[in-house]
């Protein structure tokens, strides 16, 4: 990593408040005068410059401040006004928090873009960028097409809020992140404004926010099929609405990577470029596993200069899709760097990629996996931690029905989304099919390549839940997540099919497995022919100077990141997860910020109704010099019976040790599809 200290422009920065033209959050009702908290880094110049916007609910004054310091000053040093804004009701912005990506959030974002374009220091052209939430709302606001917005960079984001976000996968409830992200956001939304920025009104603002809080899990579980709630904010509903130029980036170890493939397929090829590396849910320049990282800031600068300054940087002469194809590698939960190479495709679907079907062999087989199948799935959102990625899949394969295809004289290189067709007979109304594609080495080790899920009630569409006729046989087809991978000669391609996948997938009530008939079933691989690809090069990762946050050493031993405990007598499996969100850090202005979280996922081997989840969060914000000391403690739980999901959430907030807010929510939500 190169830390850059000299730039074409000197820079300055300031914190400001951006006035909105009126209206407030959905929770707050009508009104006006709301101001959003913003930090602006600008080049020292008399010439107007384009503005770049990053718009998040994650607190610019502390939580994202270290990451912001790596990027925004860098852009300012290259001649852009780089702007970081807190979403309404979060951080130091006024107003009350609303739902995830709600209409008010997007309308506010459009208003901010117009405000930026009107400033005397702005050229009138605006770009927008972000990762995850910021990548989502960059796409969503681009679909609203505000005139000043000319280009976006969207990283690790999704075009489909139902089938490619943290809530559902293949029509099934994503137990692991439906729960974990709802619990995380419950803690996050309860964090107070900082009196160092907003003054004495902080507590009044905080209490009003807390009164408006409703756990996200209620809404998410109330919508178990793809309905209008999920269509809002899903740009796949109308790709043509996006007028801005789109650079879409993702990683093969990020759950949102298929969005890059769909964007380069459906957007005007003269206005989009895609980039998929080996990365996790991180910016590609941060140097976090798995690498190799790239000079992503430099790459985005080419994009901004091309579309906001009318400079021909050559970025539109790059292939439509640049992607990393990994070489075969042994299973491990973390890789510093993966072996492989960059390839370029000038169209997508690519003329270099052809579907090759591999027929499954054998007679009918029973697929009735124990409920703990999936404990070796790895983390849904890998961030580069030591226990994030799936370990050796042999134990998972043993709980599945597997089919193997030898790789003989030539390597088989795949790029895109594999597809399976399974001929299934089932005696119960509800169930799930999970397909995993593995690379099996001569020594028997099994590396997970990709996977896919289908809620069998969603086989006719994600917008409905159709019971399976008892004893009926049907062919079902579904895609696995996209991947770039090479299977070498001497290895075997393994398709492993299971009927459960905990804790990723919430088990269906009454699940009893199914019979898989190999006749008529196949796996279809997107095989890329061997071509002499043009050389694809990126600069080395580069960032601006770090903020100077201190992470105090501790004598306490850290909890394991992922601990699996088996109670043999009870037949119960419990996974304890420490998501490693940051621990304690001390900021240059004296703020002490502490986060601690632990997630627990429990299930019994033969009882789908035994599944339960729990998350406990503690967040403390402390300024020793002023005595300010705010503490947030939350508990979030989900369980289910045959007919309902059962949720329980609790929030306790303290000011200097005194409880100022305490609320518990208990809710039963009908199981309509999940």
What role is predicted for each listed range?
Residues 2-46, 408:
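N-terminal cap/lid segment of alpha/beta-hydrolase-fold proteins
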Residues 44-117, 166-167, 435-442:
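Cap/lid segment of the alpha/beta-hydrolase catalytic domain
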Residues 68-69, 77, 143-241:
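Accessory cap/linker subdomain of secreted extracellular hydrolases
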Residues 121-132:
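Alpha/beta-hydrolase fold nucleophile elbow
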Residues 131-140:
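Glycine-rich nucleophile elbow surrounding the catalytic serine of serine-hydrolase chemistry
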Residues 242, 248-250:
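Short beta-strand/loop motif that positions the catalytic acidic residue
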Residues 258-272:
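Active-site-adjacent alpha-helix of alpha/beta-hydrolase-fold enzymes
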Residues 275, 283, 289-654, 658-674:
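C-terminal, loop-rich substrate-recognition/catalytic regions characterized by aromatic stacking residues
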């Amino acid at each position: 990593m190169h830390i850059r200290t000299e730039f074409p422009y000197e820079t300055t920065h300031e914190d400001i408040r951006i006035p909105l033209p009126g209206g407030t959050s959905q929770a707050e009702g009508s009104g006006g005068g709301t101001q959003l908290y913003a930090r602006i880094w600008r080049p020292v110049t008399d010439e107007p410059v384009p503005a770049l916007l990053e718009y998040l609910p994650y607190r610019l004054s502390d939580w994202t401040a270290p990451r912001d310091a790596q990027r925004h000053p860098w852009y300012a040093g290259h001649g852009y006004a780089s702007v970081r804004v807190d979403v309404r009701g979060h951080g130091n912005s006024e107003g009350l928090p609303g739902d995830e990506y709600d209409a008010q959030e997007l309308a506010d974002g459009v208003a901010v873009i117009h405000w930026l374009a009107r400033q005397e220091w702005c050229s009138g052209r605006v770009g927008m960028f972000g990762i995850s939430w910021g990548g989502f709302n960059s796409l969503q606001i681009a679909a609203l097409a505000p005139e000043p917005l000319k280009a976006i960079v969207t990283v690790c984001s999704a075009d489909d809020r139902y089938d490619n976000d943290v809530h559902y996968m293949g029509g099934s409830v994503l137990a692991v992140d439906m729960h974990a992200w709802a619990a995380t956001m419950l803690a996050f939304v309860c964090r107070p404004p900082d009196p160092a920025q907003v003054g004495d009104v902080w507590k009044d603002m905080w209490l009003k926010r807390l009164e408006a809080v409703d756990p996200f899990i209620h809404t998410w579980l109330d919508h178990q099929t793809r309905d209008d709630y999920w269509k809002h904010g899903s740009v796949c509903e109308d790709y043509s609405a996006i007028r801005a130029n789109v650079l879409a980036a993702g990683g093969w170890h990020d759950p949102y990577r298929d969005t890059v493939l769909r964007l380069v397929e459906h957007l005007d090829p003269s206005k989009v470029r895609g980039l998929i590396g080996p990365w996790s849910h991180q910016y590609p320049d941060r140097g976090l596993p798995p690498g190799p990282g790239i000079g992503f800031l430099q790459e985005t600068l080419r994009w901004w200069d091309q579309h906001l300054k009318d400079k021909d940087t050559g970025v539109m002469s790059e292939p439509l899709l640049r992607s990393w194809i990994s070489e075969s590698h042994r299973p491990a939960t973390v890789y510093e760097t993966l072996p492989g190479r960059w390839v370029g495709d000038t169209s997508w679907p690519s003329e270099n990629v052809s579907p090759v079907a591999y027929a499954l062999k054998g007679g009918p087989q029973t697929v009735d996996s124990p409920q703990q199948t999936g404990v070796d799935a790895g983390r849904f959102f890998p961030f580069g931690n030591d226990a994030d990625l799936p370990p050796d899949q042999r134990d998972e394969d043993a709980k599945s029905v597997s089919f193997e295809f030898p790789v003989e004289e030539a390597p088989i290189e795949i790029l895109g989304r594999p597809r399976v067709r399974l001929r299934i007979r089932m005696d119960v109304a509800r169930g799930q099919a999970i397909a995993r594609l593995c690379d099996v080495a001569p020594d028997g080790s099994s590396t997970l390549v990709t996977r896919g899920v289908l809620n069998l009630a969603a086989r006719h569409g994600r917008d409905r839940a159709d019971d399976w006729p008892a004893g009926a046989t049907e062919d079902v087809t579904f895609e696995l997540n996209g991947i770039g991978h090479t299977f070498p000669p001497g290895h075997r391609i393994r398709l492993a099919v299971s009927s459960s996948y905990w804790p990723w997938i919430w088990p269906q009530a009454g699940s009893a497995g199914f019979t898989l008939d190999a006749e008529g079933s196949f796996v279809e691989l997107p095989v890329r022919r061997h071509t002499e690809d043009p050389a694809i090069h990126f600069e080395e990762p580069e960032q601006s100077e770090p903020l100077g946050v201190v992470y105090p050493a501790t004598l306490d031993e850290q909890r394991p990141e992922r601990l699996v405990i088996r109670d043999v007598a009870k037949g119960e499996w419990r996974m304890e997860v420490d998501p490693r969100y940051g621990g304690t850090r001390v900021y240059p202005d004296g703020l002490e910020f502490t986060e601690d979280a632990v997630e627990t996922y429990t299930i019994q081997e033969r009882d789908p109704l035994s599944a339960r989840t729990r998350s406990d969060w503690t967040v403390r914000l402390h300024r020793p010099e002023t005595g300010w000391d705010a503490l947030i403690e939350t508990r979030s739980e989900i369980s289910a019976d045959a007919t309902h999901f059962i949720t329980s959430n609790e929030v306790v907030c303290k000011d200097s040790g005194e409880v100022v807010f305490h609320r518990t929510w208990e809710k039963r939500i009908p199981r309509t599809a999940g």
